[in-house]
């Protein structure tokens, strides 16, 4: 099964002095001999024209067409990254950057590096992260396939905004700029195309000041290395696995509620759409509620893991976590379990009194057994969450607070 590839260690800011350099332009490249010189020269000329002290770094990702030599001849500092991937090249380039600000853009001439100064202005004004927006700017004819322009980018950007409340208009624009000293906090690790999504997500979760500027998007020089569906899926997959709320909690709670409604309609013989819903409807509702409870529990576990091990916060979850303890989960699970057990016990008692004859209380039995299963899930889920919380308690023991001075 395909997995999201990540770097073994986070990229950190270069320890080189930054007093003399304001900007590092980082350009990843893989066989971009036709366009790399123009990108490097435009970057250098733009910085010279605006009095910006900076450098251009080309992160070569295994080119065999002379791209590194052409970039070096044009005035760039070339570094080599053997690990394949869009993110790998950028991580290597970021680690070598020495400027106060990092401007990033592709090597295929789709982005105009003469716009560098426009990205620096918001950073000097206090922004942390500046993104270009092709959709609010100008997309030249032939620059972006209609599938990307009207389906892929809007859908993925919408999903990202829904999950992480970023409020950006073009989440996958490749021309961006940010403060280099934020690299340790961003903790960027993905090595593939989903790197673009990770950068936006991490910036949003950290509460950084994200701003957008409209830019122009030009037809690329050379052959495109994008794969519409596989790269789109990589981005969507990354968004899902980094949002337990939308991946687990929302569908899980939705399934529980729908299952309860369906089950209640059948259990209490509520007429709907002109008919009575029988036993099979209750079975379907019970199964839906059980599966939903399990999925929602996975979401709570993922949220707990993200808090203790990744340092991620969610206002609502943090309030619930602060108020609820293991005992609350055990009590809730026990109540659900005992309710189901009583229902099943009543059915068993009736069946015994009938001499184990015909059982006409199947609906009550199924509902009771469903509650028993859900109660067990809640009980053991509460124990699992408590185990995840051991990390907090162990840290408190390892690093006790010094006694107050008396």
Predicted regions and their residues:
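Cell-envelope/extracellular polymer assembly enzymes that use nucleotide-activated donors
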Residues: 22-24, 55, 198
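A conserved hydrophobic helix/loop-capping motif in glycosyltransferases and polysaccharide synthases
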Residues: 23-32, 39, 59, 375
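Short beta-strand/loop segment that forms part of the nucleotide-sugar
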Residues: 40, 44, 50-62, 375
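Conserved donor nucleotide-binding strand/loop of the catalytic core
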Residues: 50-57, 68-96
């Amino acid at each position: 099964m395909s997995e999201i590839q990540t770097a073994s260690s986070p990229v950190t800011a270069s320890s080189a002095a930054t007093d003399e350099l304001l900007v590092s332009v980082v350009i990843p490249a893989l066989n971009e001999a036709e366009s790399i010189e123009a990108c490097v020269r435009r970057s250098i000329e733009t910085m010279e024209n605006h009095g910006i002290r900076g450098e251009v770094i080309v992160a070569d990702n295994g080119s065999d067409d002379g791209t590194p030599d052409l970039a070096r001849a044009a005035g760039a500092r070339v570094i080599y990254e053997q690990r394949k991937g869009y993110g790998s090249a950028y991580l290597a380039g970021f680690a070598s950057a020495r400027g106060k600000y990092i401007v990033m853009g592709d090597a295929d001439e789709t982005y105009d590096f003469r716009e560098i100064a426009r990205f620096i202005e918001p950073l000097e004004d206090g922004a942390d992260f500046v993104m270009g927006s092709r959709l609010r700017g100008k997309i030249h004819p032939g620059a972006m396939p209609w599938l990307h322009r009207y389906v892929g980018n809007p859908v993925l950007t919408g999903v990202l905004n829904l999950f992480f409340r970023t409020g950006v208009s073009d989440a996958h624009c490749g021309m961006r700029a940010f403060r280099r000293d934020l690299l340790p906090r961003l903790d960027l690790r993905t090595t593939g195309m989903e790197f673009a999504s990770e950068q936006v997500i991490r910036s949003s979760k950290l509460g950084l000041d994200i701003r957008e500027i409209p830019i122009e998007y030009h037809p690329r020089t050379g052959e495109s290395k994008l794969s519409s569906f596989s790269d789109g899926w990589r981005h969507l997959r990354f968004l899902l696995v980094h949002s337990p709320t939308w991946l687990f909690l929302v569908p899980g709670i939705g399934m529980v509620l729908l299952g309860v409604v369906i089950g209640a309609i059948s259990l209490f013989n509520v007429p709907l759409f002109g008919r009575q819903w029988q036993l099979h409807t209750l079975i379907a509702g019970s199964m839906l509620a059980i599966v939903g409870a399990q999925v929602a529990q996975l979401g709570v576990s993922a949220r707990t893991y993200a808090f203790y091990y990744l340092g991620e916060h969610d206002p609502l979850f943090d309030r619930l976590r602060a108020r609820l303890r293991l005992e609350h989960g055990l009590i809730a699970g026990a109540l659900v379990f005992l309710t189901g057990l009583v229902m099943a016990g009543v059915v068993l008692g009736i069946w015994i009194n009938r001499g184990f004859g015909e059982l006409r209380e199947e609906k009550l039995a199924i509902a009771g057994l469903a509650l028993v299963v859900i109660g067990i899930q809640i009980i053991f889920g509460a124990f699992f969450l408590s185990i995840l919380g051991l990390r907090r308690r162990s840290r408190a023991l390892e690093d006790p607070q010094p006694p107050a001075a008396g």
